Amino acid sequence: MVKIRLKRMGSKFRPVYKIVVADARAPRDGKFIEALGHYNPSNKDFVLDSEKTAKWLANGAKPTVTVWNLFKNNKLTESLKAKK
């Protein structure tokens, strides 16, 4: 199963996350298929390639709960559902 999830990056106590498409069995910070964007929780910076995300959702990738909540908080769920 393919998931859209967060990959932790950054330094200790200052996380920055990449939003990636990865195999569900791969480690959290391991190999991924494609990067879709990034999220910085300290300054709430959120960047996402919505076309790539819509393509992966249409192909059956499942977002994790945390990623789906990020989509909802940034009001992207309706636009992503419409592009499906």
Curated annotation (Swiss-Prot):
GO terms for molecular function: structural constituent of ribosome. GO terms for biological process: translation. The keyword Ribonucleoprotein applies. Keywords: Ribonucleoprotein, Ribosomal protein. Pfam families: Ribosomal_S16. The keyword Ribosomal protein applies. Belongs to the bacterial ribosomal protein bS16 family. NCBIfam families: S16. This is Small ribosomal subunit protein bS16. It comes from Mycoplasmopsis synoviae (strain 53) (Mycoplasma synoviae).
